[in-house]
């Protein structure tokens, strides 16, 4: 199976320009390609992951990827897929975000590969010094307003309005493609399905300035969920690639909770498992869905890819401890990850009666209720059921001297921190 055929089997091709020409080029030459990532936050998120991993797939097939950080375009704002005008971010903010995103992208590509090392570029390097007159003469002259108005990213904003700033975005992205074509021999741009208009604008600029040049575009479909909710969002917010914003445990849990209807598609999109391995998991899903083997494989592969082996091991340990109730063997760092979003209470002082702590931490509404909860076996301390209403929590109940985990009932957890 050639690269394009594999991408199609994985469901990673939404649209291409001249599919036959692109297949021929990929099969005959080492192709330089790029994908752009605008810094709209201080971290990339899992919505960016399909594009990042597609760059990696191209590199593994022998091609040369360029990850382009949009230090300049991030100052402007892409109207694609947006119903209203973006808020402009300060230059210093975008610079800081660009540096963070550059570091994140570096984890997924090989910069030492023999013959096809990856590169990371920042389009501020060439758009920043560009003066208005040069831009209008060398780029703007090649775009008619009629052509730009016909693009979906503009059409969708006709009613609500679009500023000249965002209207000009596609010309800046087109200029990126031309610049990389000239300086790096870049022949292919890939991006999300909402980037089709911007990608074809780049091809148009290359054609008008370079004649019948062979350059191509490929878009990746928008990742969807069978239940209709937005991919990459949970009740607690966006799933980020930065472990400080989304812990490896939360990240692992996101994937392990994948719907049966989505899991095989996600294995194709987000893992490097072979066709045979994925088909075996698909068969197991049909025959024994309760084992959730496909979800476990997905969660393990993607967590390892993004956060590494050790973070994966920690995420699995936390998951198993929470499932079994065996909290006492977790490290303080693992407890902090696993209980990041549960209610927490800071206890100042030494030993404390359990009844008193349950009330002061808001776990039980009154001392009477606290005693009832304890007597009824509803209170667990570090995974151990305590039914002694006279129990005193001492230093022995502090995990690594920092935390006590209290559970009320089957699932309601509370984290006690010690000042």
From Swiss-Prot:
A motif ('HIGH' region) lies at residues 39-48. Signal peptide: none annotated. InterPro entries: aa-tRNA-synth_I_CS, aa-tRNA-synth_Ic, Rossmann-like_a/b/a_fold, S4_RNA-bd, S4_RNA-bd_sf, SYY-like_C, Tyr-tRNA-ligase, Tyr-tRNA-ligase_bac-type. Gene3D superfamilies: HUPs, RNA-binding S4 domain, Tyrosyl-Transfer RNA Synthetase. It is found in: Cytoplasm. Its EC number is 6.1.1.1. It is an enzyme of class 6 (ligase). L-tyrosine binds at residues 34, 169, 173. Keywords: Aminoacyl-tRNA synthetase, ATP-binding, Cytoplasm, Ligase, Nucleotide-binding, Protein biosynthesis, RNA-binding. A motif ('KMSKS' region) lies at residues 230-234. The keyword Transmembrane helix does not apply. Catalyzes the attachment of tyrosine to tRNA(Tyr) in a two-step reaction: tyrosine is first activated by ATP to form Tyr-AMP and then transferred to the acceptor end of tRNA(Tyr). Homodimer. This is Tyrosine--tRNA ligase. It comes from Bacillus caldotenax.
């Amino acid at each position: 199976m050639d690269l394009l055929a594999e991408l199609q089997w994985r469901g990673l091709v939404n649209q291409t320009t001249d599919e036959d020409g692109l297949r021929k080029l990929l099969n005959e030459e080492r192709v330089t390609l790029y994908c752009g990532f605008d810094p709209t936050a201080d971290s990339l998120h899992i919505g960016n992951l399909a594009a990042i991993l597609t760059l990696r797939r191209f590199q593994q097939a022998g091609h040369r990827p360029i990850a382009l950080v949009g230090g300049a375009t991030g100052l402007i704002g892409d109207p694609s897929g947006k119903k209203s005008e973006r808020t402009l971010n300060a230059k210093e903010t975008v610079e800081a975000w660009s540096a963070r995103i550059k570091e994140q992208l570096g984890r997924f590509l090989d910069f030492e590969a023999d013959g096809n090392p990856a590169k990371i570029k920042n389009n501020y390097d060439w758009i920043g010094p560009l003066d208005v007159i040069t831009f209008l003469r060398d780029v703007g002259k090649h775009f008619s307003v009629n052509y730009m108005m016909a693009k979906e990213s503009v059409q969708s904003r006709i009613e609500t309005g679009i500023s000249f700033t965002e209207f000009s975005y596609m010309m800046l992205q087109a200029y990126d493609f031309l610049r990389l074509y000239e300086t790096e021999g870049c022949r292919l741009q890939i991006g999300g399905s909402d980037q089709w208009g911007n990608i074809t604008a780049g091809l148009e600029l290359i054609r008008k300035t370079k004649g019948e040049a062979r350059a191509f575009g490929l878009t990746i479909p928008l990742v969807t969920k069978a239940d209709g909710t937005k991919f990459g969002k949970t009740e607690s917010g966006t799933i980020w690639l930065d472990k400080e914003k989304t812990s490896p445990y939360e990240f692992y849990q996101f994937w392990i909770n994948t719907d049966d209807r989505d899991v095989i598609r996600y294995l194709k999109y987000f893992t490097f498992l072979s066709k045979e391995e994925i088909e075996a998991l698909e068969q197991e899903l049909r025959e024994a869905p309760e084992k959730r083997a496909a979800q476990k494989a997905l969660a393990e592969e993607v967590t390892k890819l993004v956060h590494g082996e050790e973070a994966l091991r920690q995420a699995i340990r936390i998951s198993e401890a929470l499932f079994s109730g065996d909290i006492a063997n977790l490290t303080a760092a693992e407890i902090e990850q696993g209980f990041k979003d549960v209610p927490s209470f800071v206890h100042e002082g030494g030993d404390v009666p359990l009844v008193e702590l349950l009330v002061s931490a808001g776990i039980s509404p009154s001392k009477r209720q606290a005693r009832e909860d304890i007597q009824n076996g509803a209170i667990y301390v570090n995974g151990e059921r305590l039914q002694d209403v006279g129990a005193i929590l001492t230093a022995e109940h502090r995990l690594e001297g920092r935390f006590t985990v209290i559970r009320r009932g089957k699932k309601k957890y509370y984290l006690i921190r010690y000042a």
